[in-house]
Amino acid sequence: MHELGTRQRPLSSSSSSSSSSNMTDVSAAAGGATAPAETAATSSSASKPLTNGANKTSTAMAAPTTTPTTAATAAGAAEAGAIASVAGISNQVKLEHHHRQSNNNRPVAPYPPVPAAKPKPTPTPTAESKFKSTSREVDVALRPTPARSSTISPGVSIHTQTIQQESSSAKPGMSSSSSSAQQDVDEVARLFEEKPEAFEKWLTERAPPEALSRLQEFIESRKPLKRPSVTSDLFQQWMSASPTVQQKSPRSLSNSSASSTLPECRRHLMDLDEGELFMELIRDVANELDIDVLCHKILVNVGLLTHADRGSLFLAKGTPHNKYLVAKLFDVTQKTALKDAVTRASAEEIIIPFGIGIAGMVAQTKQMINIKEAYKDARFNCEIDLKTGYKTNAILCMPICNYEGDIIGVAQIINKTNGCMEFDEHDVEIFRRYLTFCGIGIQNAQLFEMSVQEYRRNQILLNLARSIFEEQNNLECLVTKIMTEARELLNCERCSVFLVDLDCCEASHLEKIIEKPNQPEQRPTRAIMPGDSFDEKKMRNRFTVLFELGGEYQAASVSRPSKTELSTSTLAQIAQFVATTGQTVNICDVHEWVRDHNQIRAESEIDSTQAILCMPIVNAQKIVIGVAQLINKANGVPFTESDASIFEAFAIFCGLGIHNTQMYENACKLMAKQKVALECLSYHATASQDQTEKLTQDAIAEAESYNLYSFTFTDFELVDDDTCRAVLRMFLQCNLVSQFQIPYDVLCRWVLSVRKNYRPVKYHNWRHALNVAQTMFAMLKTGKMERFMTDLEILGLLVACLCHDLDHRGTNNAFQTKTESPLAILYTTSTMEHHHFDQCVMILNSEGNNIFQPRTTRTFLLLARRFLRFDLLPFRAFTRALRPLVRPLLELDVLELPDPSRIFLLTVYLRLVTRTIFLPPPEDEEEEDEVEDSVVLVVASVVVVVAVAASVVLKAELDVEALSPEDYRSVMKTVESAILSTDLAMYFKKRNAFLELVENGEFDWQGEEKKDLLCGMMMTACDVSAIAKPWEVQHKVAKLVADEFFDQGDLEKLQLNTQPVAMMDRERKDELPKMQVGFIDVICLPLYRVLCDTFPWITPLYEGTLENRRNWQDLAEKVEMGLTWIDHDTIDKPVEEFAGCADEEIKDIEFTVTTLNCNQQAQHGAGAGGDDSHTPEHQRSGSRLSMKKTGALGKAVRSKLSKTLYNSMDGSKPKTSLKLLESHVSEDMDDKSPTSPSQPPHAGGSVGRMSASSSTSSAGTVVDKSKKRSKLCSLL
């Protein structure tokens, strides 16, 4: 029955007809002891739904046959009978329940509603049988039924509701009462509450599918905050894969089943008055979201309201400048089924432009048109009548507007069916009022349809995004999938993708990929006008691959079109136009567009082409890498702006997919090239065998001969080979070779390889690594810090010191970041340090360089070499039999043997091969045949088993002292942490934590975090240990560091066009002493001071740094006064020579430049200076008088002094130069005298000592120091 006929409303308590109807229902349920009129009313109510119209009809029919008195009597009797029957039923329920409880094992017969014959005994039902027999009642109980109001007592109302539920849900053959059914349900429910596992078992094993579905519906209906929305069940149904026509709303599913029953379902609506019918029809379309179902309901309901014969509904489509009407449903009558109407409209789509025809005029003017005689109106088109044979008399056409007043459709009804020849004003008013509500419903349905389309689009785009990662190694599959999705979503006939040949497929494109892409620019989508043109010279043969996808059942094709095919194909020329201009083209008429563009030749392939949508495909750099093309929509209409928007998303994903695939191919190529480069690098980075053998055979001197235990070690006197021998001595002296069973040749090869991988830069070279490693060795041995370290940690620290600057390029991390070098891209933090560690790992992984390899493998290699020397295989037949047994073990690894076993068997196999090749052939072939095959096989098998067992046993014995995997990971972790700690940024991060531990008196450094902090501080102390070397070593090393920094500054000026910092600016080289003092105060002295406080055995590092600070401070002050220039190759002569003096005058003078107040030094003597020399420089008072501060050495004097010194280099006039110097200094010294001559002299560290005559010094000539100083002062 139709939904409108089954809709029930709450009955009014004041309605007499409603009370009468309820009473008759109760009487019928009680047994029928009522008057015939009541029985008739009961039967009428049972056969017809309880609607207002039905109640009115039944009352009207009963009125002529009864008088008022009779009716009142009948009503009273009915009410009394109802009360009595209810009381009887209540007692019957109590008795039956008591009987079931008192005798639960005997058969129980249901009590009839009225006295009847003796009931037939039945067996006692179990809980499971009750649930099976009452599954329909359970279903009724699970369904939420709204309560109905009534004027009767609550018990009667509930019973009435139960009877209505039973009468509406039970089949005609059911004989069980509602009370007994309810009791069965309650009993089964109690059983399931007591034993929920039984209920779960029944649901999983024996529940029928329909019961599970109803239960699921009930659970879903009980969810809180359930309201109709885009996330409702209807929306979920719509989003399924079924076609839209099959997605009916729940209220319309029963309506479209059979067209013959449709008039019967709606016949009861004729009994409603006009107002109720109008509201009922509005409710019918209010919540409908299926646009097809909604339009069908609108036409059917309008025909019912206006008594029209048939109707049509048109929806507005197109752009604001090109609107037209599309017939959604056409000629729908009261008997037309939904499926037939939709099928007929889809088969022949009717398009009416605005302003054409009756519907077009209504859409354009927004005014209603009521035609009384259609054939007399010039706007009427009678062609449809001629085709169908139907005669149109009256037409009423009215616009459908949204809430803003815009036209969204037009509704048209034809011919009246109630005998009238035309539509009157009443019909027009009803039509207008109803379409007002229909406009709201149509717009909601369209919005819902758009949301569904958007959801489908998003799902497709998500699938495409997923496909980009799934098909990144197969471009053909990826493009085919994208084209298939685009063709199905946009409903077009063909789809093509043209790919452009770019250099992005080459590995050299990697630098372009690394660059950050700019923001993508928006490209407007517009239709190509006839006046648009382009330069024919810009069209080039750029397409190399063409993907084509035809109809639904056609497979995709991939081809490489030739130049001739591209030049003769119209579609290809249009694609070239898009690739050249970078614009999206939407061609409505291809033939007209080709005629307007003379450069493009029209071919026969466009005869069947009507519309084309063509769009460029760009990559991240906004470079056109292809063109996507859609051809002909399935319904023959042009591509809309919405189609272009959707297609743009496909083009973007296509570009992403193509770009990603190309980058994946490039990455594969680069990885292959990287493997080749690493192989070549590993070969060239490894030391040669000749060098390794030579170093292996060299004698290694003792550590004392290399001065390895001293903190004053210098490498200036060592040749390159001696540096390698010194490294080997450190490993031997720490007992690392014997402790970890490191093969001596492997260690030699590794040392030579490490030296080979250092670049010949000025400071961060192999000798710097040697000095760092020697300082670590001295700290461990002389500084007694090895007692805080394990042997494994000592090994890791020495390896880290030697490898901490591998492949250093002479530039720091900041320079790598500024220039955006590949290293800076590869490592974001501690760039060079990570690279040094990677180089260290690369060398260790090179063949023959892994000093951390397990001992068992090396042992079995030695066993293999020894095995080859013995002659264990006397028979040729034996070798032939044993060889096929050993070879599968080596190739297939059937026994899953460990590495030593495989090596041992490989040795056996090699021995068999060599014996087979080099053994002379037997003199007597028959003697060889005498050996039985079975004996040979048995002996060969025994040899294999023994070899495997022996290798396993030997491995178990030798693994005791091997470097286990845990030890290997531990030593590699130590090496990595130590190398990264040489980054001063890491030092500053760890320094505060280390200082806190030292200040708290920490003495246990065995924890993992504390040990890591200690190792990091030790690595930094070793890395900057050149600052603690003797002054004659330190100032040379400082000059090397400065030169390397100056080279980086030159690169910054040249490449980056920026001004470098002071320490890297060659023009500010005179500030080097001052910068050295700052470096010592900020980094070196605090580090060495805290280390000395904790480990007093390394005090020489602190003292040497303090001494060098005094020297740098003095030199910095002399630079400020102009007495020296930092422009030599090395700073071994910080003060200029007095080349103008005669040799005989300075023959025995040892120039000692300490301070400029030489007279005070002469007065106080060496004792005062010696006492003060032990006081740290930065702790002394600033009482020392400087000629710079007093102005004793003016600018003019310094200029003349400079000229005198440099002009006297040739020694032509030494005496004159000396006198000139003396006169200038004396004049200036007389003008400015010291303010406090009694102050103690400043004991800054001596900058250097220069002997004027080495022969005199060697002869042992004794010179008075005070006399020397006096002579020097007299010269000044």
Curated annotation (Swiss-Prot):
Residues 109-124 have a biased composition (Pro residues). InterPro entries: GAF, GAF-like_dom_sf, HD/PDEase_dom, PDEase, PDEase_catalytic_dom, PDEase_catalytic_dom_sf, PDEase_CS. Residues 147-166 have a biased composition (Polar residues). Residues 1-76, 91-185, 241-260, 1162-1193, 1205-1276 are annotated as: Disordered. Pfam families: GAF, PDEase_I. Residues 1274-1276 form a propeptide. Residues 688-1119 form the PDEase domain. Residues 1266-1276 have a biased composition (Basic residues). One of its GO terms (biological process) is signal transduction. Residues 12-47, 57-76, 167-180, 249-260, 1248-1263 have a biased composition (Low complexity). Residues 129-140, 1171-1180, 1221-1233 have a biased composition (Basic and acidic residues). The modification Cysteine methyl ester is found at C1273. It is found in: Cell membrane. It catalyses: 3',5'-cyclic GMP + H2O = GMP + H(+). GO terms for molecular function: 3',5'-cyclic-GMP phosphodiesterase activity; metal ion binding. Belongs to the cyclic nucleotide phosphodiesterase family. This is cGMP-specific 3',5'-cyclic phosphodiesterase. The gene is Pde6.
